[in-house]
Structures are given as C-alpha cells and as structure tokens.
Amino acid sequence: MSFKIAFIGAGSLVFARTLFTDIISVPEFHNIEIAFTDINPDNLEKTRELCQRDLDANNIPIRIEATTNRRDAFKDARYIVNCVRIGGLEGFETDVEIPLKYGIDQCVGDTLCTGGIMYGQRVIAEMLNFCKDIREVSEPGAIMLNYSNPNAMATWACNKYGKVRTIGLCHGEIHGEQQISEVLGIPREELDVICAGINHQTWYISVKHNGEDMIPKLLAGFEAHPKFSQEEKVRIDMLKRFGYYSTESNGHLSEYVAWYRKRPDEIKDWINLDNWINGETGGYLRVTREERNWFETDFPKILAEPVKKLDGSERSKEHASYIIESLETGRHYRGHFNIMNEGCITNLPWESVVEVPCYVDGNGISIPKVGDLPLGCAAVCSQSIWVQKLAVEAAVHGDVQLLKQAAMMDPLTGAVCNPPEIWQMIDEMLVAQEQWLPQYTEAIKAAKEHLANDPLIPTKDYHGAARLREKTPEEVAAERDARKITA
C-alpha cells in the first residue's frame, strides 16, 4: 500500500510526533510516503531527525522528506495533516494581552472571544493559501485533517472557500468521556456515547450503559467527585442549568459564554488554579511562554530516550490515524469529527460546522442525522455559530465591519465591553497583528490613523483576575525533571 501524507506545522514536535507515530503504527502503512513541512527549519529538522530515528530502529523503510517548501510537501499527497499556529507566540500574546486592557479576561483565547476571533483572521488567511496549493499539486480529492484552532472557523473556510474537503479534529470529546466513565464508575468501552454541538461546545446528549440512560446520574456524580467538583465548576454549572455535560475544559468553556468571566471579583469562584486549563487568566499563554525554549533544552534529552515502538502499543486516541486507516484498509472506526452541518443537526444553521458522530470505512466517511439538539444547548451553540460566520466572512473578504460585528456578538466580549470599546480594541489588534493580516491592508491603515489622531477611550492596566507568575526556564526544567523521576 502506497500513498502520501503531508504534515504541515511539523515543527510542533510533541503533537506532530504523536500523530506520525499513530499513523506508522498501522502495519499496512510501512511503505507510504511522509513529508514534513514547517516555516522553522531548525524545529523541522529536529522533528524529522527524531521520527526518522524511530523508523530506523523499527526497521521501517520510510525516508521522511522534510522541507520548508509547502508545495513540495503537498505534491501528490492524499492526506494533509494540519497543526499550524499562525503568528506563533508573538501573535498569541496580542490575542490575550490587548483584550485584557479592555477588561476581557481569557484563559486560552484560541476559539471564540476576542482572541479566538482575531486568531481566526490569521489562520483563515493562511489556510486558504494551503487550500490553493492542495488543489493545484496534491492528489485529486485530497483530504485535509485540521487540528488548528479556531477549528470550526478554519474548517468552515477551507470547505466553503478553499474548496478542499476538510475534517476538523479535536480531542475534547475523548477527555470528557473519560471523565464521565470515572464519575459513573463504568469502563469507558462499556458506555455508548453520542456527542453533538459545535467544536468546544459539544454536548453529551446521550450516555447509555446496557441501554440505561445515565445522564440523570451525571450531576450528582460530578458534584460528589473530589477532583472534578473543584476543577470543573463551570462545566458542572452548565450541566445543572442546561441538563447536559459539555466536552470542553473548564477554562475554555468559561470564555465562550457570557456568565463566568465578566466580573473580575467573581472569576475565581468559577475556576481552579491547580492547572492552567481550569481557568487561569492567560493560562495557556503562560505555559507556552515557559516552554518557548523547549526544543533547545530538552531535545538532546529526548534523543537519549528509548525509541518509540511503532507496533501500535503506544498509539494515542487522536482521530487522524484511525480515519486514514479506515479509509485505506476498510476497517471500521467511529469518532466525533467537525464537518459541515448540512442538516445533520436540524436546529442549527445548515451552513455551519458541527461536531457529531461519524463512521469511517473503505466507502468513505458516513454522517448520521443527529436531529434536534436540546433547545437550550442549541441556543448556546447558535450564538457562537453566528460569531463564527461573521468572523469567517470577515477573514475571507477582509471586511472590518463584519469583524467588529463578530466581536460585538461574542458573548463574553459583549458582556464586558460597549460598542465603542470593541471598535477601538479591534483597531488596536489589527495594527498589532498587521504582518499576518494581508486582507486588512486598508482597514489597518485607517485603524492607525484613528489610533494616532482621534480621542481614545481610556484602557486599564489590568493583568487579569487569576494570573500566575511565569516560571523561569530553570524552574520549568526542574519541574520537568522531577516529574520524570516521580514517573
């Protein structure tokens, strides 16, 4: 069996290596072609070196092609696995830090809220370039498996405007299912679970064990759980008020809705600072900053570690390898993917990206009809979908009016800021992110003139209600070494 898979964003060592290892764990895939591409040649070469070492040690005769030329990597590829972060750490910092000046306190800022909307402008602009290359040089009908956030926006733009079949993938549903298994005391493989909604706002609308409906037991189970009751306060409150548990982590979910992060003095009531993902202000940004020199400090140590076994024993639960395996071998796989709705969830807009159960085999990807979401869940998702639609259309057409309307309609942004503040904030973010936003050339010129010449709304020297100190490189290294010793 021979075909080609291209990884873009392959300089992201841990995630790219995980996906690569998963794919090569399929015995039939030991003669396929693999190409890695990234804009950072040093990180790209390190990832190639490590993955090639794993191949050689397992006597698999694949030679990885690594190139900074995207089109060369995409040439004749049947599958493109995308895990890029457009703007890197520099762009990410502006997604979090500028909104804080206006009182918007985000934990992550990569999916919705002001940070996610602006991240979407950068990602969509570049991913449409990816799509052009895929159409021109990849195998006809090539599929892009997208891990980049904001996942729904990027997947929507690539399908509608990029004209490349794009499947959005996320692991939130997998983690939530593990939590439900623990709360119920039932092995995960014995649970029959259906999730439906939109990326990072998907709901466990059916949880059954031997035919018994387990959803009525979830609230009491989560409230009684010693760990989850402290770490998942937003998710539990949403479960209490909407009747269904959400797939997304506490910190992520808290910034997608209007209620939990709008008053600084109440934010700590809803979060937990034991782990950044539970709601820390700028938590993911802090961790990313702390790990920014990771390649230089840890790569030699990783090279000294035992090679990965490519026999399937270390295969993760990430969907990408199972999708490719099923399409190529005919084996069956069921997972929850992000796809164009087109009537799958009947009370969400036809033109939107939804996250739903899908079945994969040699005949393709089959998408069963979910029907209506519970009305309250649909209402939450619908508001986010309209933000996504405005943001997608803004990014594709460089329409600054739609961009600012997307920010106005965003639940948390609208709960904290008034329209003039939103207008000024978006102008400031456009100027700060100019290098990644070629579609906004004229709007950025106008924003610069406004910020330089017009009376400005005063902003705050505000660093968030739940911000932790960034650790030094030495502290990070010591903690990592301590974890290895403990393990």
What are these regions (language model features)?
Residues 75, 81-82, 146:
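Redox-cofactor binding/interface segments in oxidoreductases and associated redox assembly factors
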Residues 185-486:
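Long, compositionally biased stretches enriched for glycine and/or charged residues
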Residues 90-160:
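Rossmann-fold NAD(P)-binding glycine/threonine-rich loop
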